[in-house]
């Protein structure tokens, strides 16, 4: 137990270092499926293991799944639940989420955002040196600018923010599969 606690402390310190450098962050997180020892990537998930029901008949919803790191974390912790994944960014959906279905069972991936009505909306993605910093993707452009000012203040002038149209589905209109 002590060795596991020491490992987790070191792991979460390493994750903070990774998250402080955009190039390293993208390199590691884009390839996290090869670094499963980093999962779950947040210690809060260990608490969720104590309070969430690990049941094949229960459901987990991963909204704004991005790379699917939370979903991978749940699977690496042993959760067998159905997981419904929602990610509006098509590039991430295609490159990172679709392959997860081959690795993990009972995943249901969807390439749209959830909302209170069916429509399309602008989705903003910052790019650094031509690479998307997808974890800052947002419907709110100023949120991205403020997040970068806080997280990577010296890089703000090197960031290009691109706009994409994405589909939003009304949450209560989704039909169960």
Residue ranges with predicted function:
Residues 2-177:
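Phosphate/nucleotide-binding beta-alpha loop and adjacent structural elements of enzyme active sites
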